Amino acid sequence: LEQVELNFSAKLNCFFGQNGMGKTNLLDAVYFLSFCKSAGNPIDSQNIRHDADFFVIQGFYEASDGTPEEIYCGMKRRQKKQFKRNKKEYTRLSDHIGFLPLVMVSPADSALINGGSDERRRFMDVVISQYDKEYLDALIRYNKALAQRNTLLKNEMPVEEELFLVWEEMMAQAGEVVFRKREEFIKEFIPIFQSFYSFISQDKEKVGLIYDSHARDASLLEVLKESRTRDQIMGFSLRGVHKDELNMLLGDFPIKREGSQGQNKTYLVALKLAQFDFLKRTGSNTTPLLLLDDIFDKLDASRVEQIVKLVAGDNFGQIFITDTNREHLDKILENIEGKYKVFGVENGSVAERKGDTE
């Protein structure tokens, strides 16, 4: 994106343009201000334009009680990124997570179904971290201890058991918190997800989620101790909450094996809308932002219509939608009562289309 300054509608903002023009980058800038990182590229320096030495993203928000908030992120090549709230720099970026809750639905979500278990763990982490600081702290502690244990496992010289125990005890303590909170979350989340899926599919299929963890049947410390000899042969930790799995079912079978493109897409949209609903009712005093990037592709007309009915309702706050198809956007706008803005995106520049309702 080139330098862009935009004023958004408080309700609905639509962006249309051909692929590769910058629509997704625009949503990614909004995402960055919520999560301190890009949705698509975890390497910060790669988010700087090739012909530039830095990037800056600045967002001006209004909380539900009317309080203004300014969020700033800036980064120069070969320097640490700066993240500020109301001109005061964060010492820990994790303190910002959850302040501006956000849910994004994008084509990259297909990895939730087709990718490895790490994608599904990340889905749980992203939701729970936005409303539960204890969870985020436990997850950070667990991952640090896991990295230290893996370093010991790779050591070619014998390592004293006490050293292993230091990190295993930390993994067990933090891992039990992670397991308990993931289990509580999934139990509450399943009925919300199922109700969204049945609304979009008009009750055509049944769906489910099953959470599996090594922490379920035994103490995590015992699991780690028992696995240590095998782990040393492999050079990494084979068991623990970093191997948890969230099984995604269509009927009684894995959707990865059974689902059509339309069913997979419906599943992903329902997961993310349930994530939104869950965040809205759990702890946050701010309605999450909703980012919908090219979500109507591969869906039949009736499912598109059901999704449009959902997002046009009062349950959602500020929404950002991208599509290559102007007709899709016009169909949504017909159903919207109240404020919206439409923007055209071309070759990295963004222009508001006048004549549209503000």
Model feature map: region roles:
Residues 32-43, 274-282:
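Post-Walker A helix-loop "phosphate-sensing" segment adjacent to the P-loop in P-loop NTPases
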Residues 34-113, 117-119, 125-131, 135, ...:
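Nucleotide-state sensing region of NTPase/ATPase domains
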